[in-house]
Amino acid sequence: MATFPHFGTAAIHVGQEPEQWDMNQVVPPISLSSTYKQDNPGEPKGHDYSRAGNPTRDVLQKNLAALEDAKHCQVFSSGLAATSAIINLLKYGDHIVCSDDVYGGTQRYIRRVAVPNHGLEVDSVDLTDVQNLEKAIKPNTKMVWFESPSNPLLKVVDIAAVVQTAKKANPEIVVVVDNTFMSPYFQRPISLGADVVVHSITKYINGHSDVVMGAVITDNDEFQQHLFFMQLAVGAVPSPFDCFLVNRGLKTLHIRMRAHYENALAVAKYLEANDRIESVLYPALPSHPQHEVHEKQTKGMSGMISFYLKGELQESRAFLSALKVFTLAESLGGYESLAELPSIMTHASVPAETRIVLGITDNLIRISVGIEDLDDLVADLDQALKIAIPKV
């Protein structure tokens, strides 16, 4: 498996230098202080107040920026807090082109907060074809927002092609890529020309399902200044303890992602060969419609798989209820395997007519394949499928 050079070494060492601490701690300490003594009025030693900055947060931000091969990282109290900070860069009347298949929470924020409350315009299009982007761009377009792969349909967008198309129309258009499904271990959108990368740290980066956090990563100095000010003004900061947990989780990110990929590829192949399954959506499979694009711009794939059962809502409910190793729950990216029904769970806020057009139907199952023993995962899926669909 070809990976970015020195990733594991960077994850373990960048920003973690013992010499930055008074006692040369090998593991960065948790700085819980909300305020800091100043030697003279208006002359703080490093930080003045923890909403503006915190040593434990600094360590995490340096590490994440390095892993995306970028200059700046700002971490927020959630992925949607990070999303709102990015979109707040825009002004009244500005236009966003958004991919039609994104996380339901992102859609909800843009359509029910940013558009009615802040006067933004949005068009949702299928960005797997850049001609759709060309047609959607307007004189007031200021941002293009997408995920690759997307949630939950695992559509792959050619990041470099989108960047080229957007910048040709207007060099000032900001291209934002949500890299949550891939992590920087498998994909680095900034190296492909994206201006901004956003992560729900809650997922693969933390990897232990015990933190809610988001990150915005960029090479753009002006954009970073905006992010810092927005966080200072709004106060969407993560706790030092959560920053410590994520920083610890990063030390095994490269190991975890390899295990997720190995398990998920085997599970996807099993599902594709199963008579109870209509189709499987996993970009690492040659059958995936954007498989070649995925291979071109990534170093592998995470544990995210979506698939269509041969059935309807009744069969989906029966399948999910019969699982024993997979847990019926929202979220993804932890060491444990999860399964969910997007139409009534993660994407329930998407209008029903939109879900139908996109293909988020009641027989679409999304699974986050964890790092348990592969044989146990396959056996669990097999027994649940046989219960849900007894005859084929």
Curated annotation (Swiss-Prot):
Its cofactor is pyridoxal 5'-phosphate. Keywords: Amino-acid biosynthesis, Cysteine biosynthesis, Cytoplasm, Lyase, Pyridoxal phosphate. The keyword Membrane does not apply. Substrate binds at R51, Y103, R108, E330. It comes from the Eukaryota. GO terms for cellular component: cytoplasm; endoplasmic reticulum. Signal peptide: none annotated. InterPro entries: Cys/Met-Metab_PyrdxlP-dep_enz (IPR000277), Cys_met_metab_PP (IPR054542), PyrdxlP-dep_Trfase (IPR015424), PyrdxlP-dep_Trfase_major (IPR015421), PyrdxlP-dep_Trfase_small (IPR015422). The modification N6-(pyridoxal phosphate)lysine is found at K203. Its EC number is 4.4.1.1. It catalyses: L,L-cystathionine + H2O = 2-oxobutanoate + L-cysteine + NH4(+). Pathway: Amino-acid biosynthesis; L-cysteine biosynthesis; L-cysteine from L-homocysteine and L-serine: step 2/2. GO terms for molecular function: cystathionine gamma-lyase activity; pyridoxal phosphate binding. The keyword Cytoplasm applies. It is found in: Cytoplasm. Transmembrane segments: none annotated. Residues 40-50 have a biased composition (Basic and acidic residues). Residues 32-55 are annotated as: Disordered. Belongs to the trans-sulfuration enzymes family. This is Putative cystathionine gamma-lyase 2. The lineage of its organism: Eukaryota, Metazoa, Ecdysozoa, Nematoda, Chromadorea. The gene is cth-2.
